[in-house]
């Protein structure tokens, strides 16, 4: 097998060199954005793999080469955007030119050949899927309809924590948060806790990890030989088939429940999709594969980002005790005398500081630091530079949100920076784009925030939080794990102390 791989790589190298020589002779010279020096065949990859977190490596490179920087990841031209002005040029001024997604072979497999909305190619099918998602799955009314689910899952979460507090135990809060968000999202998506839940989430976790890998097949997409030898491709096929098997069973069971008149089955996202599937007037065909691809989007984008943001909120509050005390005082004053908090309570209370905490966590710890890559649909000029058709584009929102030119004390957690500010995460303030901007902005931001706000308020209301013996706030690790989503690298282990016991604790 090793000999085959070496032969394949050698063949690709020869083809790549000949192709570049031909291009140099036949193509006019372009004014490309600056970038670091490259090596034959691998291009700029050696600059990126020096750091396990590519967005950090890209920030350092951008300091030298500018806010529009060209890298070559193997044979893939890659534009890195690292300033608000450049982000606005890509996501607003030239939004249509960059409205496509860069899809590698593994992502194409996982999304049933790009049938989904998040990674689907820009066009009529994509427009209809996005419209359907925004109006039917992620609308304010749909998010509101899941209120009871969120309240029940938060109450269950609080009872579990109260039991640990009574026993004097420490907890891995990051794991508990992930479990809580997953349970909530499964019920919102499928309608109830699912016996296949653990299997599906395990397959999804593998799929997301494979999608983020910098595999040989993905950096040399023109080589069919390397594609066929790629282990990432085989992992993607196995993960997709496992998810399809589980989702297929869920779809069949949901259809049976709907046919039998089970009203509870009509409350979930998957039931909405299956109901629309029967609509003859729908301008696109909503096949079972499309439904499964959309469920991949919803789970992948919804569960990880919400749990990651809630974990970072608690991490930073533990690191900054004065900020924690201020947030707790606001929540405890607003809900004084209550044994549990509901979303109706949240809507009537003016928890201004709590919202600032969430905003600041999203700034300092953007859930998807490079967003999802776009692709240049047509050759164009951006800020005086030529951008070739097919260029992969990363917007480094992690770097932009930590740029000291736009943020005072950029590396510090200061929710107060948003006081007397109109900045929001709706994609119109280009120095603050945790959910992106333009046609490819994440449409599920409202659901993601709704899934974490009640939980955060409850964590602050019901419990005080202590670090394990011997640890100081400054010792809490804030390094991110490698991957598409910037999860906390080390679990947040804390000792909960009951302040106001939740109901039935």
Swiss-Prot record:
Pfam families: p450. It catalyses: (S)-beta-macrocarpene + 3 reduced [NADPH--hemoprotein reductase] + 3 O2 = zealexin A1 + 3 oxidized [NADPH--hemoprotein reductase] + 4 H2O + 4 H(+). GO terms for biological process: defense response; diterpene phytoalexin biosynthetic process. It is a single-pass membrane protein. The chain crosses the membrane at residues 7-26. It comes from the Eukaryota. Keywords: Heme, Iron, Membrane, Metal-binding, Monooxygenase, Oxidoreductase, Plant defense, Transmembrane, Transmembrane helix. Disulfide bonds: none annotated. Its cofactor is heme. Its EC number is 1.14.14.160. It is found in: Membrane. InterPro entries: Cyt_P450 (IPR001128), Cyt_P450_CS (IPR017972), Cyt_P450_E_grp-I (IPR002401), Cyt_P450_sf (IPR036396). Heme binds at residue 442. GO terms for cellular component: membrane. GO terms for molecular function: heme binding; iron ion binding; oxidoreductase activity, acting on paired donors, with incorporation or reduction of molecular oxygen, NAD(P)H as one donor, and incorporation of one atom of oxygen; terpene synthase activity. PANTHER family: 4-HYDROXYPHENYLACETALDEHYDE OXIME MONOOXYGENASE, CYTOCHROME P450 FAMILY 71 PROTEIN. Belongs to the cytochrome P450 family. Involved in production of the antifungal phytoalexin zealexin A1. The enzyme sequentially oxidizes(S)-beta-macrocarpene via alcohol and aldehyde intermediates to form zealexin A1, a maize phytoalexin that provides biochemical protection against fungal infection. This is Zealexin A1 synthase.
